[in-house]
């Protein structure tokens, strides 16, 4: 069984609310998070210091035990 291409293997954050992502298929992309900040679930990420704590866990980007984002969504909406 092959690993899905959209599994996140690494993330770096930027102060401009970008996620610089590496995926399991070797592609690297940039996901602009600014439009996501409008969504109620991501309101706490308006705190830049908290946004910058993003890390990879179980193949996707997470901030804490309650907040993550679907890796498929990141892959489909990243600029490559």
Task: For each feature predicted by the language model, list its residue ranges.
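Motif-centric detector for short Cys/His coordination patterns
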Residues: 1-80
């Amino acid at each position: 069984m092959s690993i899905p291409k959209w599994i996140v293997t690494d993330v770096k954050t930027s102060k401009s609310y970008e996620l610089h992502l590496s995926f399991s298929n070797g592609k690297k992309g940039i996901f602009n998070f600014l439009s996501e900040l409008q969504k109620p679930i991501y309101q706490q990420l308006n705190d830049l210091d908290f946004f910058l704590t993003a890390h990879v866990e179980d193949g996707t980007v997470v901030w804490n035990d309650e907040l993550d984002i679907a890796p498929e969504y990141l892959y489909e909406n990243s600029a490559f």
